Amino acid sequence: MDKTGVIYILTNPSFPEYVKIGYADDIDKRLLQLNRSECIPFAFRVYATYEVNSRLSDLKIHSIIDKLNPNLRSIENFNGKQRIREFYAMSPEDAYSILEAIAEIHGCADKLKRIAMDEAQKQAEETAQEIDDEHKERQSPFRFSMCNIQPGEEIEYCNNPEIKCTIVD
């Protein structure tokens, strides 16, 4: 039986390099299901929806993306089983453009909705970005310039001030 639902594009600041593309009869209930988990630091948010008249029509979108680039989908082997998920390594804008093209081909562009972020979502996005930036900074090799110590300046060993060196980076 056909029923109106939506193909959705979800984002999550916990993994900004991925989008989740799926189907839901009720997008609000789907968000509640996904965001109930304590396993992810930030909540999923709806980037866009595309109203459709048949369940599981998202599988057709998955098939198109997989045929164009099978490396975009999140697939892993875990405990001897292959886990194939609805996550794709693409920007939400790229995912949206795929749905937009399909909507235009079918003359249903009015059924495609891009959802604006509210203030709480913007704040969570900024927090996640700050955490990611901090993490990247901690992973990068140490440079004295990170401590505002410039080339040519001299530093000394704290346990023996007679041991000195000149900064060259």
Give a label for each model feature.
Residues 1-149, 161:
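Non-catalytic accessory segments flanking enzymatic or RNA/DNA-binding domains
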Residues 163-169:
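Short beta-strand-centered aromatic/proline hotspots
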